């Protein structure tokens, strides 16, 4: 398989962004065993490919085990992933668990099955990680997934919450990591096409796509077309939170604010401090109708005293 210079730049960018995310969040450490969850989609293929490349030149030693969950969906091409994983030489395990039948039994016809399916799948993944001795679980969510989740939670849940690049499972036994957190979906899709990964379609279960997520995705893509770089800026905002300028009393002690306590940058109270401050304009019966907004000074007490004494003698 021959590739162009553009491909190698793309590959380098994905590896660099993944390596930076791993370093920034301490995702992988020396001696870790990482269970790499493979769905057969572009994201998980890309994640495995990038992690294998980084593993070869990393200054630490860690083990990768690829895992696919065969949920017994009708028509699932169960031969594709084992053949691919053998061809790239990674250790792997195929876990069979008939979650499909459970979902079909519990969810009414025509309703989205993704929520229950993901919960059942998560339980199997955690159990598999425990049995294999894997302390890290790698998922293929990327930057766009994280931003979409942020808006979904804000629009439909009333929370400022996204997908963390790294989190601990509820029982505290495993750490879930998202190595592609800094990577764009566009780059991942381009890489997957160039690598000719044997993609397994994600609609085998017959479930409808999450319509809310689809709408949010379309909204973000429309913003990106109008203002290139918008999604990246939103993701950067998730990494640069200023609690004092939000309204969550659990994150910032608003009730404890008082005069004489310099809690925040005063200038930032009036807006973005990176813009050059413009002179204030005044209209009216004054000598000068233009002044710089720097500070106001009161006359010294000594200068005001004679005037007060004079007034008292009259």
Swiss-Prot record:
Family assignment from sequence similarity: Belongs to the TtcA family.
Catalytic reaction list: cytidine(32) in tRNA + S-sulfanyl-L-cysteinyl-[cysteine desulfurase] + AH2 + ATP = 2-thiocytidine(32) in tRNA + L-cysteinyl-[cysteine desulfurase] + A + AMP + diphosphate + H(+)
Listed GO biological process terms: tRNA thio-modification
Segments forming a coiled coil: none
HAMAP family (UniProt xref): TtcA
Localization terms from the record: Cytoplasm
Keywords carried by this UniProt record: 4Fe-4S, ATP-binding, Cytoplasm, Iron, Iron-sulfur, Magnesium, Metal-binding, Nucleotide-binding, RNA-binding, Transferase, tRNA processing, tRNA-binding
Cofactor annotation remark: Binds 1 [4Fe-4S] cluster per subunit. The cluster is chelated by three Cys residues, the fourth Fe has a free coordination site that may bind a sulfur atom transferred from the persulfide of IscS.
Keyword Magnesium carried by entry: yes
A GO term, aspect molecular function: 4 iron, 4 sulfur cluster binding
Quaternary structure, from the entry: Homodimer.
Keyword ATP-binding in annotation: yes
GO cellular component: cytoplasm
PANTHER family recorded: AMINOTRAN_5 DOMAIN-CONTAINING PROTEIN, SULFURTRANSFERASE-RELATED
Amino acids binding [4Fe-4S] cluster: 114, 117, 205
Additional remark text: The thiolation reaction likely consists of two steps: a first activation step by ATP to form an adenylated intermediate of the target base of tRNA, and a second nucleophilic substitution step of the sulfur (S) atom supplied by the hydrosulfide attached to the Fe-S cluster.
InterPro entries according to UniProt: Rossmann-like_a/b/a_fold (IPR014729), TilS/TtcA_N (IPR011063), tRNA_Cyd_32_2_STrfase (IPR012089)
Protein name stated in the entry: tRNA-cytidine(32) 2-sulfurtransferase
Free-text function comment from the UniProt entry: Catalyzes the ATP-dependent 2-thiolation of cytidine in position 32 of tRNA, to form 2-thiocytidine (s(2)C32). The sulfur atoms are provided by the cysteine/cysteine desulfurase (IscS) system.
Enzyme Commission number, as recorded: 2.8.1.-
UniProt cross-references to Gene3D superfamilies, sorted A to Z: HUPs
Required cofactor names: Mg(2+); [4Fe-4S] cluster
Domain of life: Bacteria
């Amino acid at each position: 398989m021959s590739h162009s210079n553009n491909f190698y730049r793309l590959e380098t960018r994905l590896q660099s962004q993944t390596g930076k995310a791993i370093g920034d969040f301490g995702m992988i450490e020396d001696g870790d065993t990482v269970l790499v969850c493979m769905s057969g989609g572009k994201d998980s293929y890309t994640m495995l490919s990038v992690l294998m490349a980084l593993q070869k030149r990393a200054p630490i030693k860690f083990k990768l085990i690829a895992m696919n969950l065969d949920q017994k969906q009708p028509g699932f091409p169960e031969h594709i992933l084992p053949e691919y994983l053998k061809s790239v030489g990674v250790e792997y395990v195929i876990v069979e668990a008939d979650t499909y039948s459970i979902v079909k039994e519990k969810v009414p016809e025509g309703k989205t099955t993704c929520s229950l399916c993901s919960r059942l799948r998560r339980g199997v993944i955690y159990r598999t990680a425990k049995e294999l001795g894997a302390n890290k679980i790698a998922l293929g969510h990327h930057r766009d997934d994280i931003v979409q989740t942020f808006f979904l939670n804000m629009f439909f849940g009333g929370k400022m919450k996204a997908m963390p690049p790294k989190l601990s499972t509820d029982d505290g036994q495993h750490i879930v990591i998202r190595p592609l957190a800094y990577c764009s979906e566009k780059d991942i899709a381009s890489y997957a096409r160039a690598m000719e990964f044997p993609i397994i379609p994600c609609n085998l279960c017959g479930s409808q796509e999450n319509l809310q997520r689809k709408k949010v995705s379309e909204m973000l893509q429309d913003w990106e077309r109008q203002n290139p770089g918008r999604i990246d800026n939103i993701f950067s905002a998730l990494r640069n939170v200023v609690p004092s300028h939000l309204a969550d009393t659990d994150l910032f002690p608003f009730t404890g604010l008082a005069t004489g306590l310099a809690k925040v940058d005063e200038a930032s109270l009036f807006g973005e401090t990176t813009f050059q401050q413009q002179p204030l304009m005044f209209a009216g019966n004054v000598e000068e109708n233009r002044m710089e907004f720097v500070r106001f000074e009161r006359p010294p007490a000594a200068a005001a005293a004679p005037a007060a004494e004079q007034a008292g003698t009259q």
